Amino acid sequence: MPVGVPKVPYRLPGESAPQWVDLYNRLYRQRLLFMGQELGDELSNQLCGIMIYLFAEDPSIPLFMYINSPGGSVTSGLGVFDIATVMMQDVTTICVGIAASMASLVLSGGSTGQRLALPHARMMIHQPEGGSRGQASDVMYESSEVERLRDIVVDCYVERTHQSRETIIIDLNRDLFMSPRQARSYGLIDAVALPAVKEEYTGFSMFS
């Protein structure tokens, strides 16, 4: 039986008594964002809206986005990627579990030096897919649009990984899975996050 989203206490500024809010709402207030499901319009709009709101509230405080997603809609992924890369605010992206397809592109869109993966995470890149059905004119239009989106995705990976365009095109032709070390060498992330020594634990440490 599903338990739903847990609720946790949170005291609003100026309030004497805490209120019970859902876990993700509480974490958003701490500038911790989660992409924990397939990326569609609803999740994309939520993430983009939260990032824009938090940027407007205080652009000097960084955001942290935890990613455990199989990917999803190309346009939804590009929306989150664009917001993360164009805002004048540090966005740390962290792969927890898997960042596949468009989720791997969002992962790569974190601020330079702040794109991380946990030790046993997996990343996967491949080219956008389209389901061409219907009349011939519709199929041709969709094929053209898929090619356009594919070129955009290739350009984004080239910019974020510094791999050659030829390398990216070849690698996107199949499901290319990577370990954190491989993703770091590829340029998809900057470092692998490791827990610090227990006695001195303050969060995650990194090695490059």
Curated annotation (Swiss-Prot):
Q: Where in the cell is it found?
A: Plastid, Chloroplast stroma
- Determine if Mitochondrion is one of this entry's keywords: no
What is this enzyme's EC?
Answer: 3.4.21.92
Name the catalytic site residues.
Answer: S101, H126
Name of the top EC class for this enzyme = hydrolase
Q: Which reaction does it catalyse?
A: Hydrolysis of proteins to small peptides in the presence of ATP and magnesium. alpha-casein is the usual test substrate. In the absence of ATP, only oligopeptides shorter than five residues are hydrolyzed (such as succinyl-Leu-Tyr-|-NHMec, and Leu-Tyr-Leu-|-Tyr-Trp, in which cleavage of the -Tyr-|-Leu- and -Tyr-|-Trp bonds also occurs)
**Keyword list, A-Z:** Chloroplast, Hydrolase, Plastid, Protease, Serine protease
Q: Name one GO molecular function term.
A: ATP-dependent peptidase activity
Q: Does the keyword Protein biosynthesis apply?
A: no
What's a GO biological-process term for it?
protein quality control for misfolded or incompletely synthesized proteins
Q: Give Gene Ontology CC terms.
A: chloroplast stroma; endopeptidase Clp complex
- Its biological purpose: Cleaves peptides in various proteins in a process that requires ATP hydrolysis. Has a chymotrypsin-like activity. Plays a major role in the degradation of misfolded proteins.
Question: What is known about its subunit structure?
Answer: Component of the chloroplastic Clp protease core complex.
Which protein family is named in the record? Belongs to the peptidase S14 family.
From the Swiss-Prot or TrEMBL record, give the protein name. ATP-dependent Clp protease proteolytic subunit
